[in-house]
Amino acid sequence: MAFTVLSDENVKQLFQGFGPEDVAFASDVLTAAFLSYSVGQEAQYQPHRAAVVRPNGQTGLFMPATTEDGMSVKIVGLPPPSSGSTDLRCVLTVCDGTGKAVGIINAEELTAFRTSLGSILLYRYRKRTENIVVFGAGKQALWHLRLALVLRGSDIANITIVNRSQERAFKLMERLRAMDRASGVGGTDMVSFTVIEATPDSAPGNDLLRSVVEKSDVIFCTTPSTQRLFPAEWLTSERASAKSRYISAIGSYKLNMKEIDPDFLRAVIDTPLGTFSSAHGGKKDGIIFVDSREACFLEAGELVDAKIPAEKITEIGEFTDSLRKADEAEAELLRDWLENGLIVYKSVGIGIMDLSLGKVILELAAKHNIGTKLPDF
């Protein structure tokens, strides 16, 4: 394969036409990566990412990864808090198993896609997904909603976007509709969109926001917040706990950050809130799903603040392996839990996600003759 350079527009072009079959294929690739990390031998060969914070608050993240047949390094630039921007800049270099570089990818869109796909791996099982609430209006919010619409568009009736800026939320809605038109998949014309302008400071007194959170079937948290996005009580009250939901939180990546109230996480593992009893018999205690237990203990502020013990945390690769190996009765219970139980997923991202999906994107680019080729690199 010739060395390939993919710009941001190239990557968007490749993703634009993704339909259910493409998402299913990418899901299988990411699932295999999680399995190799959690129950294979790959975890020991993954250097942990490094973060450097400059005096002005500019942050650089360096995320290496290796597998038997590849290596990669992603560099992420995060603006200082004083800039007022949450947009990140990132680039992924992909090598083969010998270390020969095979491609370089503008990874802004890819990062949002791979993180969102991690959330969707568990979401796709859900029986009820009528009411979705997403916190944030950036690329992560876009791809969480886009993937949900591609896979479950006919089952989604209401999407509420919660953001400090209405303008950005409306731009998100427009891009979702444009992607729908370009691919013919998504069903945005059948969905009712609502925008709520709110911040973590203003949320506690916002009755409308509380109402949509309590009625939600799915909550996607996609913001780099240093405060809880809403109080735990909104999910632990008698009215809110009468229904189950799927919740993912992917925005916080430092110990001083948190999206989900730590009190809610404690309630999931310490109270009947997280307990699932199947109508067919069988019971599961509340746990927190993660991409990497080690990475989350180092970087997930809400998990650390909640003091969630290791035995109450399950990696998605571990769970997938358990489901794959379970006997018929246990497998039925696990699937019922995923479909109807309270499922909470926390991700900080790991390099093997970038490497596995980066290789897929390079292969798709070669197939469709997209990008710039450098045969003599």
Task: Explain the meaning of each model-derived region.
Residues N206, R210-S211, K215-V218, T226-R245:
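Rossmann-fold NAD(P) dinucleotide-binding segment
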Residues S356-F377:
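Phosphate-binding loop/pocket of nucleotide- and phosphate-handling active sites
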Residues M1-L122, L355, D376:
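N-terminal ligand-binding/catalytic initiation module
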Residues G103, N131, D217-V218, Y246:
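Structural motif
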Residues S119, R128-R152, I156-R168:
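Glycine-rich adenosine-cofactor-binding loop
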Residues G153-T199:
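NAD(P)-binding Rossmann-fold cofactor-contacting core
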Residues T223-S225, G251-S252:
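Short glycine-/small-residue-rich Rossmann-like dinucleotide-binding loops
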Residues W234-L235, A240-W337, I361:
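Rossmann-fold NAD(P)-binding glycine/threonine-rich loop
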